């Protein structure tokens, strides 16, 4: 019997995805609840054909330099700020992520945060639980979303999905990107320079990826340019925000409220000062955390790995230049396949 390719999984993932993976490859998985030591992982990779990357893990040339059989690395995530794509490309290793699968789910969470924060749902619910129904102060009254302006920073597919929900609530949507989209009329959105967006928006939602350019983009100067009545939402990446600057902006009234799915650091230590800020709602990075979406992400990751270890094209490859190519079919083989499919070629010139 032909030996199956070996895939290393450096952490805990869905059991159904592992079962699916094992139908096609041999799996060696780190099943401890602790983070797998990097040196141990490097030893495991010596004989591996594929790696299912589980955060936290920095993927670079150092990790894969002694893995001569490694043909693919994949991760159940859209973002890949923990992966050095240039170094993997130089090593000829395709990297697969999971775009498209989670767009609607993350957009739902982003707009849930916007709606929850705008009406101070958490604070008002707590007043009821505490038996203080009639004592809630006026500063948690909230505001309407209709006739307000939502500014989206990072208008990719998820941003477009958020904008669709915002318009259904009667909001005007503006956005800032590295480049203006060509489909503004279709989505009824307006491109703005960043400073104009900050000055105009009642809600600022960050959806940008983490890059050298976006690291700490939301700093002291950024928050000073926002309305002091504005709501700030981050569903992108934690390090895009200077956490100290955000804390100061919330405490001094430079902005009114923040709702965060991501933080820096992440997870937040129990004694972190951001947790003491009353006008800040934090959830533990649950943007894609629904059962169906996590399943779809896991299966797509498994499919990318299965394809890669067999040197077949990954469905979703970031560094497409080193993705495996479909073999070219010669004319005779193509005609034979058409005949097998029942195509009548007798009338073809």
What are these model-predicted stretches?
Residues 1-48, 170, 325-329, 333-334, ...:
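N-terminal glycine-/charge-rich "phosphate-binding" loop or analogous flexible N-terminal tail
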Residues 10, 54, 76, 207-210, ...:
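Short, well-ordered coil/turn residues at beta-beta hairpins
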Residues 30-33, 76-77, 93-104, 177, ...:
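Short beta->alpha connector loops at strand-helix junctions that form conserved
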Residues 46, 59-63, 178-273:
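Rossmann-like adenosine-cofactor binding region
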Residues 49-129:
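Phosphate/diphosphate ligand-binding glycine-rich loop within oxidoreductases
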Residues 95, 172, 220, 229-349:
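Rossmann-like dinucleotide-binding domain for NAD(H)/NADP(H)
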Residues 99-149, 161-164, 183, 313-320:
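Phosphate-binding beta-alpha-beta segment of Rossmann-like dinucleotide-binding domains, i.e.
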Residues 138-228, 336-349:
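Rossmann-like dinucleotide/phosphate-binding beta-alpha-beta segment
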């Amino acid at each position: 019997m032909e030996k199956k390719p070996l895939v290393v999984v450096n952490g805990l993932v869905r059991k159904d995805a592992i079962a699916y993976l094992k139908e096609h490859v041999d799996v060696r998985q780190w099943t401890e609840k602790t983070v797998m030591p990097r040196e141990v992982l490097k030893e495991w990779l010596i004989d591996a054909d594929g790696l299912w990357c589980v955060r936290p893990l920095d993927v670079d040339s150092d990790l894969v330099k002694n893995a001569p059989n490694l043909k693919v690395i994949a991760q159940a995530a859209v973002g890949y700020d923990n992966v050095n794509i240039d170094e993997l490309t130089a090593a000829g290793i395709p990297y697969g992520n999971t775009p498209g699968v989670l767009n609607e789910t993350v957009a739902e969470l982003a707009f849930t945060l916007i709606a929850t924060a705008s009406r101070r749902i958490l604070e008002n619910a707590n007043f009821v639980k505490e038996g203080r129904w009639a004592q809630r102060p006026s500063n948690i009254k909230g505001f309407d979303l209709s006739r307000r302006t939502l500014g989206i920073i990072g208008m990719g597919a998820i941003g477009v999905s958020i904008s669709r929900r915002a318009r259904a609530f009667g909001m005007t949507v503006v956005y800032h990107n590295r480049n203006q989209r060509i489909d503004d009329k279709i989505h009824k959105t307006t491109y703005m320079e960043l400073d104009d967006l900050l000055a105009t928006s009642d809600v600022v939602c960050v959806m940008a990826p983490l890059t050298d350019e976006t690291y700490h983009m939301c700093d002291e100067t950024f928050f000073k340019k926002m309305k002091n009545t504005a709501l700030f939402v981050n569903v992108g990446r934690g390090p895009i925000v200077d956490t100290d600057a955000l804390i100061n902006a919330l405490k001094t009234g430079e902005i009114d409220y923040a709702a965060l799915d991501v933080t820096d650091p992440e997870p937040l230590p129990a004694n972190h000062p951001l947790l003491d800020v009353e006008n800040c709602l934090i959830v533990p990075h649950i943007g894609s955390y629904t059962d169906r979406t996590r399943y779809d992400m896991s299966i797509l990751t498994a499919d990318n790995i299965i394809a890669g270890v067999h040197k077949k094209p990954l469905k979703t490859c970031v560094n497409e230049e080193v993705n495996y190519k479909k073999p070219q079919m010669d004319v005779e083989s193509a005609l034979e396949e058409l005949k097998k499919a029942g195509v009548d070629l007798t009338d073809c010139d």
